């Protein structure tokens, strides 16, 4: 019940702002799906495109999922949380949740865009790990139907949830590529030196103490 309440609050927090934002996005897809708890709370179509980050579309479903996640996290640590109360100077709990959510979806979108640009995809081992993880979830919740109910409580479709899970593995593959000498993403010495110069960093080979 608490999860449902949190998601309803998340929907109320964001509905007015996002409805306005989507109305300003012109040619972006507004969506047609009407399923899910977060749609009931916000009135936003899950498949509606909310924003573009590096050419990667962020759907209302993904944004609302992460917003509900943030709200649930905050409500765990702040009893009877007042979302309009000030957390810090000029920033309410509601503001913080929305800002943090935006940073999360931006990160996930950038990872997907960079992976696509670099031709990085999931490996067979990644897919096996994802399949094993799903099986763990199904077992934990007591079967396939129970797992699907849990996703419904979270207000997200399995397709969207899988998309999020896969991004974590793409992030690891990107990290591997950046750290593997000889890969297309591995920065050479000149690139690192230029980056240091552009950002006013000091570099050195040996530090004597």
Which residues does each predicted region cover?
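Short, low-structural-confidence N-terminal segments
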Residues: 1-99, 202
């Amino acid at each position: 019940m608490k999860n449902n309440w949190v998601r309803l609050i998340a929907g109320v927090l964001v509905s007015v702002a996002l409805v306005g934002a989507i109305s300003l996005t012109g040619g972006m897809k507004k969506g047609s799906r009407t399923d899910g708890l977060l749609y009931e709370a916000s009135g936003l179509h899950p498949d509606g495109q909310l924003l573009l980050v590096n050419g990667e579309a962020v759907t209302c479903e993904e944004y609302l999922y992460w917003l509900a996640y943030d709200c649930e996290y905050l409500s765990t640590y702040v009893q009877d949380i007042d979302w309009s109360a000030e957390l810090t100077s000029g920033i309410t709990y509601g503001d913080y949740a929305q800002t943090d959510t935006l940073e999360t979806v931006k990160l996930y979108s950038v990872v997907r865009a960079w992976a696509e640009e670099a031709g990085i995809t999931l490996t067979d081992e990644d897919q096996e790990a994802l399949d094993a993880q799903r099986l763990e979830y199904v077992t934990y919740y007591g079967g396939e139907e129970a797992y699907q109910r849990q996703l419904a409580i979270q207000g997200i479709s399995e397709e969207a949830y899988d998309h999020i899970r896969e991004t974590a593995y793409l992030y690891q593959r990107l990290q591997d590529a950046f750290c593997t000498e000889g890969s297309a993403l591995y920065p050479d010495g000149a690139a690192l030196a230029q980056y240091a110069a552009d950002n006013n960093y000091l570099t050195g080979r040996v530090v004597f103490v």
